[in-house]
Amino acid sequence: MDGIGDGTESMGFDMPMLMNQQPHLFGSYGHDGSPVAPIFSNPTFQDEPSIGAADDNSDAKRRRIARACDMCRKKKIKCDGKMPKCSHCTNYKTDCVFTQVEKKRNPPKGAKYIEGLENRLGRMESLLRLSGLLSEDDGGKTDLGTLEKRLADRYHASGSNTPHNPQKINIPSQSQIAMSQQNSSSHYSTPRLESQSSPRTAATSPESQKESETEVEGLSDMMCSLVTNNCGETRYIGSSSGFSIFSPKGIQWVNEKTGDNSFQEMISSAYVDDNKWMYWKPEIFSDIFARRVFKPLPPKDEAMSLFKDFFDNFNCMFPLYHEPTFMHLVERQYSRDPYEGSGWWASINVVLAIAHRLRVMSNLVPQEEDRKAWLYLKNAMGVLTELTMRNTDLLSVQALLGMSLFLQGTPNPQPSFFLVAAAIRLSHSIGLHKRGSGFGLNPVEVEQRKRVFWIAYLLDKDICLRSGRPPVQDDDDMNVELPSDDPPDNIGNVPLSDGRSKFNLFRSMCRFATIESKVYKRLYSAKASKQSDGELLNTIGELDKELEDWKDSIPLDFRPEHEIKASHTPLILHVVVLHFAYYNCLTTIHRMSVHHGYWTSRLSNYAIQGLNARPLNPRVFLSAVLCVTAARASINLIKYIPQGDFACVWLILYYPVSALVTLFANILQNPSDARARSDVKLMNVVVNFLSTLVSDESNGSIKRMLGLCGEFERIAKVVLDKAEKESYSKKKRKSPEEPVNLQQSTPEEHPAPSPSTTQPTQAPSRNVPMSSPLFAENPGDPGGNTMADDAGGFASSREIPGTTGVSTNIPPNIQAMPGIAQDYQDMLSPDPLEGVSFADQPPYSATANTPLSSFQQPFVPQDLWQMPMTIEWDWADMSTNFPVFDTNGPPHGGL
C-alpha cells in the first residue's frame, strides 16, 4: 500500500491511476453514473491513510472535505478538519465524529444522449481510420472539408478502371470492422463489390449512395437467371435458390475458376432441348390435356375486324398484348403452319371473346352476340389445366389475365380471384416481377413484360381492397419500373380537351394500384392491427396525402371530383372505373378512423395534447365527412354507365352498392343531418338502377341485391320520418313566448373553449353530444344565429340569407390546434367538389327548423362498419330471405 501511495504522490493526481484503464468518456461521473468531483476521480486511493502521511511537512490537517464534523455542523460553524480532532471539538472536549452521508445525484438531463453521440463519433472515427481517410495519429486535426475532399477523390478513383492503389484500403464489411477492432494492428481490404454492401458512413455523398444502390441491384439481377428453350418458354430462378449457380453471375464465376467455357456450353445445350413437362405422365394426363374446340375460329376477314376492335378500343388502355407480335401469330394461325402452343390458342380466343363483348357493349350488335363471346372464352378455358400445369411463357400469363378481365363482368367473382392469382404465380415463373436488366431482352420485350406484370398487379390489388383478402404479389419482392409515360406506340395515352396535350391513363392506373396496396398493407393487414393510436393516425394521414397527390396529378378532364370530359364510350368506361376506385380507396382509408371510433375523447385528447410525434394531416379529423361525400359522388357516377350492359354493370356494381350502405349507416346515426333527405334520394337512384337489371330472369343475384338495397331505403325513410316527428313534438312543447337565444346564456352555461385549459374539450362520440354546433353560418356572432336545444343538448344553425353550401364554423377542439383551423375550414368548403354534381340534391344549408346532430359531421357508426364490407358480385350464399321484386320494379317506382 505504501508503494501505491508513493507512486500516486510521485505521479500527481492529474495522471490516471491505472495505466491500462480505458479513458472515460465522462470524467465527471463514476462508473455508476453518480457525479464525482475531479479530485476524487478514483475514490479507492483517497481514503488511504498513507496518502495523508506521505508529506513530512504536513500539519496533520485533514484534506478538504465536503462535510464538517457533526458538532460543527450542528452549531453551524466552520470546521478546520484537523486530526484527530478539529479545533472546536478540542476546545469543547467533545467527540469529533464525521458521519458519512452518501449523497447520490442523477446525471444531468441529456447525459446518456451525449454519451451515445460520443460513442457513435468514436465508431465513425474508427471507420474513417480503417478506410484510410484518417491517419492513426490524426488526433482530430483533420477538418470536415478535407475529409469530404478525400472521400470525393476516393470515389472518383474507385469509379475508374485503373488498378486500386495498394496503400488505399476500401471500406470493410461489418464483420471485418469487428475483427479490426479486436486486433487494431491488422487491416483488411475487400473487393469492390463486397465493399458496396458495407455500412455507409456519414461522409458518404448522396451520389455515391445512389451509385452503390444501383450496383447492388445490378448484382442482385445478375444472381437471377432466365433460361429460354427453343420453344420460347422461359424459366426464372431467383437468387435465393440453391440453383443460382446457373445464373449469369454463377456461370461467370465457374468460368473464371475453371479457365474455360465448358460449363456454360453444357448448360446452354442442355436447355435448348428442354421441353419440361410436355411429355410428363402421358398415360395419365393425355386426355385432360386434349384440346377441345367448342366454337371454331372465325374466317380471317371477320377475325381481323374483331382484332382491330380489340386493339383500338381495349388494348390501347389495357395493353395486354403487343400488337405487331400478336398479328404476326395471327397470320401464322391462318397459314398452313399455325403455332400450336396452348398459350397462343387461349390468347386468340380470349381476344375474340373480349372483342365480341365490346361490340355488344357499344350496341353495335344485338345482345345475342354475347353468346359468341362466351363460346370463345370456353375454348380458352378448355386449355386452362395445360396453362397452369405445363406452360411457362408470356402468352399463357396474358391468356389468364384476359380470362380474368372477361370474367370480371360476371356475377361470380371466384373465377377472377383464381385466374389473377394463377397469372401472378405464372409471371413469377418467367421473372416478370424482376427488372430483368441481365436477361438479355430487347427494349420491346422489356416494355411488354412490364405492361403485362402491371396489369396483373393492378387487378390483384383491386381485388385485395374490394374483397379484403391478402394480395398475391409482395411489394417488397418486385423491382419493376412503371410503364413508360410516353411510349413510342402511344399505348395508354389519351388526348386532352385542348387538342395538344395527352395523358397516360394506364401509367396513372398503375400508380394508383401501388397506393391501394399500401392502404391494405398499412391499415388492414394483420401487422397493421398492432399499430398504436399515433402510428395509425399518421398512417391514415400519409396515405390520404399520397392519394390526393395522385389525384392532383391527373388532368382536369379525367380528375376525380370533376366532370368527365370524354366522348369515346370505352374511354369513358375506363375513366368511370378509375373514379369509382378512387372514391372507394378514399373511403377505405378513412373508414379505418371511423371503424376504430377515433372521433371520441381518446382521439381528441391524443391530438390536442400533442401526443403525436409529427403534425397530423388535418383531414384525419374529417374521416366520416369524407366517407359520406365519397359515397354521394360514387352514386352520382351511375349516370355514366351504359344502359343494358350487364358485363359493365357487374364490373362496377360493388361501388354504388357499398356507397348505399355508407349513406344508410350515416342516416341511422345522423337522422337529423341536413342532407339526409337528399341521401335517401341517392339511395333510391341505386335501387332504381338495380331494378332496371332484373328483366333477365336468370339474374337471381340482382334480385337479392335489389331486395336488400330496397330494404335499406325503406328503413332509412322510416328513421327520417320518426326523427322529424320527434323534432316537431319538441318544438310544439316549447312555449312560443319563451325565446331561446344564446345571448341569454351565461358563461357558466356555455364556457368558451380555451387551448390552455388543463382538461381538453370533450370530442363528440356516438353517446356524447356536443353543446356547441359544428356548423354555424356566422362564427363571429355569438348570439342570434344559433339556437340551443335545452332538452337534448343539441344545437342547430340558422341560415343566413343569401348563403348556401357547407358552413364553415370550426369545432372547438380543432380551433384550439394552431395551424389546423384554416385547413379544416378550407376542407369544409364546397370548392373541392364543385365539379361533382349530385342529381336532385338541394344545397347543403342548415335552417332553424333543422336540428343538427352532435358535432354535425356525418358519423358512420362502428357497428355497421363491422358488417362484411365485401359485398361481392354474387350474393347467392346469403342465407337470409330477402324480399324479391318483380320485373315491374320496387314499390318506390322506377326510373
Curated annotation (Swiss-Prot):
InterPro entries: AtrR-like, Transcription_factor_dom_fun, Zn2-C6_fun-type_DNA-bd_sf, Zn2Cys6_DnaBD
GO process terms (BP): DNA-templated transcription; positive regulation of transcription by RNA polymerase II
Bilayer disposition of the protein: Single-pass membrane protein
A Pfam family: Fungal_trans
Record bears the keyword DNA-binding: yes
Inactivation phenotype: Results in a hypersensitivity to the azole drugs fluconazole, miconazole, and itraconazole. In addition to the medical azoles, also shows hypersensitivity to widely used azole fungicides, bromuconazole, tebuconazole, difenoconazole, and propiconazole. Impairs growth under hypoxic conditions and attenuation of virulence in murine infection model for aspergillosis. Cures azole resistant phenotype in a clinical strain with cyp51A G54E mutation.
Record field: compositional bias (Low complexity): 755-765
Transmembrane parts of this sequence: 648-668
Chain residue ranges for the region called Disordered: 156-218, 726-813
CDD domains to which the protein is assigned, alphabetical: fungal_TF_MHR, GAL4
Chain residues forming the annotated DNA-binding region: 69-96
UniProt-annotated location(s): Nucleus; Membrane
Record has Electron transport as a keyword: no
Biased composition (Polar residues): 158-207
Subunit structure: Interacts with ncaA.
Chain's role: Transcription factor that regulates expression of the genes related to ergosterol biosynthesis, including erg3B, erg24A, erg25A, as well as cyp51A that encodes a target protein of azoles. In coordination with ffmA and ncaA, is responsible for the expression of the ABC transporter abcC/cdr1B/abcG1 related to azole resistance. Directly binds both the cyp51A and abcC/cdr1B/abcG1 promoters at a conserved 34 bp region called the atrR response element (ATRE).
The protein's name in its UniProt record: ABC-transporter-regulating transcription factor
Native species: Aspergillus fumigatus (strain ATCC MYA-4609 / CBS 101355 / FGSC A1100 / Af293) (Neosartorya fumigata)
Lineage start: Eukaryota, Fungi, Dikarya, Ascomycota, Pezizomycotina
Underlying gene: atrR
